[in-house]
Each structure stands twice: as structure tokens, then as C-alpha cells.
């Protein structure tokens, strides 16, 4: 049988006015700032008014290491939220906003897929409510003020060779990675090397997603390091006096966006930091607000459990005082086969042996999540080519790891297909076995925190750091940054730094190439391998196929 595309399904959605969606979770019309009929922001005054309520249960959705076969983490997040509502629970989902650049690069975007989507899909993948534009503007204002300060006498004695604040644009544009700024004569300032990152890689984005309120936002913005003097002392954004104006630009962007699923259940879609050099989770303010409004909140973290879940648990939960009741690890039969050595072209053919061979990757993720004291449920995201024998092989393996796997058909059937997963998740939560703990304490030395993640999560023999890196970490400790968590930046495709090393490898080391201080966001980035903070477009970007049809509808975006 033929299946409809995501965009066809989304266009058939019978959306309810956003005021109705807000009313489902107790948000009155006066507390919604509508952007059209189907999306709105939630007012800061409403958010403040619910802070004394008890929290609901937090459910984190993560996955195995991503493969080209696709795992469907967001699709499962949305499907589980709908499934919980279907079985009579008061639930909502919290996911990230899409970055504009990749939507015109690699084909795709979308929030979920099949019959487990959040709408309005096209708007969410384009300008949405303008949050990313506001972040780009705030970041760019600081960039302009730094160069302006240097131009008008450089009172702060900034070393123009050590301006570390790069510019941003929400587009994939490799030509901007390394540039020379201020060319063209004396009137244009002092020429220096500079460069652009994509907006989601901005520290401003990470800060917006970790700040508790506007006061916290301004303090974090002011704490960002933008440059160094000749004596290597840091220059902060507050020294440039940019933090106040940046906060003004971000005032509305701090308010969570509310939209709906295909089944008219509420969803917060807010923020979208890089899952690599940042923590890859939606905003703290959206998650904490949702927990005050619903009994069950389903959220996700970028990439696999070794990156996204580790950062969610060690960074976001630590900073926001959150504790998940259960973690859902998404796996697919196709990905198990790929981890078991099957080529992508052959994934449609039954191969139980390959499924069994590929389960080691899943097993390590289950073990890792359990080490945080949180129970695990495995969601087998169903593909039409899966056979009963292959699904059973995954279930048997998961059972051998002390967890339970549930087949979920949300892509094909919506909440009807995810109801069994929802029932299992509620059953696990009601047992009350969660006893969340972070991987390392705040006062552990920074180098030991990096070792803890590399040994405890990746299962490396050790993290290799040279004297220069160790000295830098010690200096930051002496400057008062020693209690910050670490944010590992490495390939998402493997536990190692080699993206082609699948499964659950052992007997390897993790080379730490450099360390970066994100003082405003509040973490130390450990760069392992090459990090791309400004993507490029592929040979045939999807933008070539995007256009308006005769009816004014967008074609080619999905």
C-alpha cells in the first residue's frame, strides 16, 4: 500500500484555534500572545503565576547512536505524548525549534513524521515566531558593539588578535567560516580575522535555553567572554555594555511557543541549541512550565543517548533542578541491522542474525541510562519492512538487559499505535523506582569530569589531554569556573571519535583536541575531533526544489 508524505498528512490536519489548545492545560486566552490562529507565545506573567505548583512526571526520549536508517526520536516523542492523552493522561510534549539553514540544505525539517507530527509544520520549519531571528539579532548586536568599541579607542584594551566572539547567520554558508573583517580603509575599522557560525551554535542560543527568567538571562549574557586583553585577562559582554540591549531583543523570544499535534494535543516548541558544542535540548523555561501544567511531560535530547541524554541529565537537569521519572530509548530494527553490518540498500530484507549482532549498541545505552538511577523503556519504532521475528529478537535482547521493549506504530497509526508504549511508560513511572543522580559532583576537578564521561559513558580507556589543555582547565578552576559541568563535542555516530566505528567498541581512547569556556551558558566544552559550527550546503541543496505551487502552497520543503 502507498503511504502519504508527511506534508500531505500535515495539510489534512484539522487544527483547533490555539486558544482551545491552551485551555486544555489551563492557559487562558489573555495569557496567550497569538501568532495567527495556530501558534502563540505564553506570557511571562502566566509562567510566573504557576511556579508554586507541583511538578508532573518528566519523560526523556533518547535513542541509540543515529544511523542513516533514521531512528525517529522526535516522531516517537510526539507519538508518546498523543498516546498518553489517548489513555486518559494529562500530557504534553516539549521539543526544539528547527534551524532554517539545514532545511534548505539536506532534505527535511519537520517536527515528527507520519501521524505523529506537530503542526503548523511549514511555519515551524521557516520563520515560526521569529525566535531564531531575535537570537541572531542579539548576537549580531554584540558583534557590532565589540568592533565599535575597538574603533572608538579600545578603552578595554582588547587584543584584536584575540576576539573570540564570532558572528552568526541562520543559514548553511561555508564561504563565511573564515573571513577578514573591516577591510576598505581607515573608516571601516581595524582589519582582523573573523568568521561566522550558524545561529544554533551561538552561545546566546544555549543561554536562552538554560535561563530561568529574564534576570537570569541578562546575567548569563553579561558573563559571556567575547575577547582577551594582551595580558590574557577576559573581556565580558557586560564590559561592552551589550547585555541590557541584548536582553531587550530577546524578551519575547524567552516566552515558550505553544502549538498542537495532529491530534490537537498541546506542544511547547522552544529553542534549539546545537547538540554538539551545546546541550541540544529545548528550553528550561518551556520544560519547567510544562511540568507545572501537566501530569506527564515528554521531551527529547539531540542525537543518541551518549551525547543528548548525557547532556540532558548532567547539564540541563543539574542546572534546572529536574529529575526524569523514566527514559525512553528509541531503537529500530533497521538500525540494529545496520549496526550488525547490513548495507543500507539491504535493510528491507529479513536478517535476524544481523539484528542480534547489532543490539550491543542498544545494550550499552540501556546500561548507561540506568547508571543515572532512572528506569528505561525501549521503544521499537516500527517500520513497515520489520518482520515479527526481527522485532522479537530486539525484545528478547532488551529483556536480557533487564528492561522491556514495546513495539510502537505511531508513525502509521498515531496515538492508536503508541498507546501500548504509553501504558508501559505509565506503569514504569507508577512503580516509583527512579532515583536520579548525575554522573559526577559539581566539585570534581574539570579534567576528572571529562574522564568520567569518557570512561563511564563512552567506555573509553581514558581521555587523552595534553599539558596545555590540563593547564587551561586548572586556570579556569582558579578563576572560579571549576564547578561547571562539561559538554562533550564529538561525533554522534559512535561511542568513539571515529564515526564509522559502530556497535559497542572497547579498547580505545578519546583525544581531547581543545577546551572552550562557555561562561554565560555555564559549561566547559571539550572538543574531541573536528567540530563544524557552520555547515555547508550539499551538491544539490533541497532549496533547489522548494517553491510555491499555483495555489500558493509550499512544495519541496519535506
Curated annotation (Swiss-Prot):
The keyword ATP-binding applies. SUPFAM superfamilies: P-loop containing nucleoside triphosphate hydrolases (SSF52540). GO terms for molecular function: ATP binding; formate-tetrahydrofolate ligase activity. It catalyses: (6S)-5,6,7,8-tetrahydrofolate + formate + ATP = (6R)-10-formyltetrahydrofolate + ADP + phosphate. Pathway: One-carbon metabolism; tetrahydrofolate interconversion. Signal peptide: none annotated. It comes from the Bacteria. Keywords: ATP-binding, Ligase, Nucleotide-binding, One-carbon metabolism. One of its GO terms (biological process) is tetrahydrofolate interconversion. ATP binds at residues 67-74. Gene3D superfamilies: Domain 2, N(10)-formyltetrahydrofolate synthetase, Formyltetrahydrofolate synthetase, domain 3, P-loop containing nucleotide triphosphate hydrolases. The keyword Transcription does not apply. Its EC number is 6.3.4.3. Belongs to the formate--tetrahydrofolate ligase family. This is Formate--tetrahydrofolate ligase. It comes from Jannaschia sp. (strain CCS1). The gene is fhs.
Amino acid at each position: 500500500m502507498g503511504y502519504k508524505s508527511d506534508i500531505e498528512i500535515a495539510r489534512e490536519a484539522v487544527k483547533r484555534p490555539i486558544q482551545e489548545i491552551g485551555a486544555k492545560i489551563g492557559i487562558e486566552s489573555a495569557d496567550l500572545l497569538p501568532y495567527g490562529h495556530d501558534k502563540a507565545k505564553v506570557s511571562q506573567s502566566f509562567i510566573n503565576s504557576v511556579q508554586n505548583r507541583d511538578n508532573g512526571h518528566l519523560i526523556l526520549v533518547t535513542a541509540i547512536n543515529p544511523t542513516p536508517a533514521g531512528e525517529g526520536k522526535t516522531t516517537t516523542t510526539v507519538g508518546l505524548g498523543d498516546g498518553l492523552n489517548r489513555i486518559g493522561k494529562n500530557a504534553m510534549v516539549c521539543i526544539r525549534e528547527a534551524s532554517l539553514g539545514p532545511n534548505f540544505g539536506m532534505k527535511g525539517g519537520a517536527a515528527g513524521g507520519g501521524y505523529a507530527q506537530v503542526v503548523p509544520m511549514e511555519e515551524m520549519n521557516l520563520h515560526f515566531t521569529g525566535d531564531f531571528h531575535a537570537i541572531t539579532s542579539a548576537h549580531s548586536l554584540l558583534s557590532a558593539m565589540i568592533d565599535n568599541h575597538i574603533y572608538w579607542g579600545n578603552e578595554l584594551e582588547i587584543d584584536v588578535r584575540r576576539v573570540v566572539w564570532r558572528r552568526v547567520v541562520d543559514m548553511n554558508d561555508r564561504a563565511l567560516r573564515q573571513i577578514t573583517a573591516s577591510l576598505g580603509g581607515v573608516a571601516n575599522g581595524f582589519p582582523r580575522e573573523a568568521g561566522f557560525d550558524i545561529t544554533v551554535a551561538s552561545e546566546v542560543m544555549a543561554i536562552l535555553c538554560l535561563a530561568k527568567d529574564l534576570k537570569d538571562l541578562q546575567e548569563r549574557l553579561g558573563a559571556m567572554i567575547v575577547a582577551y586583553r594582551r595580558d590574557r585577562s577576559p573581556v565580558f559582554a557586560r564590559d561592552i555594555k551589550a547585555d541590557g540591549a541584548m536582553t531587550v531583543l530577546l524578551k519575547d523570544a524567552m516566552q515558550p511557543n505553544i502549538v498542537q499535534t495532529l491530534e490537537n494535543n498541546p506542544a511547547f516548541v522552544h529553542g534549539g541549541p546545537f547538540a554538539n558544542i551545546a546541550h541540544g535540548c529545548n528550553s528550561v523555561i518551556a520544560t519547567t512550565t510544562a511540568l507545572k501544567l501537566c501530569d506527564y511531560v515528554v521531551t527529547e535530547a539531540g542525537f543518541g543517548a551518549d551525547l543528548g541524554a548525557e547532556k540532558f541529565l548532567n547539564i540541563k537537569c543539574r542546572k534546572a533542578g529536574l529529575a526524569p521519572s523514566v527514559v525512553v530509548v528509541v531503537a529500530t530494527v533497521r538500525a540494529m541491522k545496520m549496526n550488525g553490518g547490513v548495507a543500507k540498500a539491504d535493510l528491507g530484507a529479513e536478517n535476524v542474525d544481523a539484528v542480534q549482532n547489532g543490539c550491543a549498541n542498544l545494550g550499552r545505552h540501556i546500561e548507561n541510562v540506568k547508571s543515572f538511577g532512572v528506569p528505561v523503556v525501549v521503544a521499537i519504532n516500527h517500520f513497515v519492512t520489520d518482520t515479527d521475528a526481527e522485532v522479537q529478537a530486539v525484545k528478547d535482547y532488551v529483556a536480557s538487559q533487564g528492561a522491556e521493549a514495546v513495539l510502537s506504530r505511531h508513525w502509521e497509526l498515531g496515538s492508536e499505535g503508541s498507546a501500548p508504549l504509553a501504558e508501559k511508560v505509565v506503569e514504569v513511572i507508577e512503580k516509583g523506582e527512579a532515583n536520579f543522580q548525575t554522573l559526577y559532583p559539581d566539585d570534581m576537578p574539570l579534567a576528572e569530569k571529562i574522564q568520567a564521561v569518557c570512561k563511564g559513558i563512552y567506555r573509553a580507556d581514558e581521555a587523552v589531554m595534553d599539558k596545555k589543555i590540563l593547564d587551561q582547565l586548572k586556570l579556569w578552576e582558579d578563576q572560579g569556573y571549576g564547578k561547571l559541568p562539561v559538554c562533550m563535542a564529538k561525533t554522534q555516530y559512535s561511542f568513539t571519535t571515529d564515526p564509522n566505528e559502530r556497535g559497542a567498541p572497547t579498547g580505545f581512547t578519546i583525544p581531547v583536541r581543545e577546551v572552550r569556556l562557555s561562561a554565560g551558558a555555564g559549561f566547559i566544552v571539550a572538543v574531541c575531533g573536528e567540530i563544524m559550527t557552520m555547515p555547508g550546503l550539499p551538491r544539490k541543496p533541497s532549496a533547489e526544489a522548494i517553491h510555491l505551487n499555483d495555489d500558493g502552497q509550499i512544495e519541496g520543503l519535506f
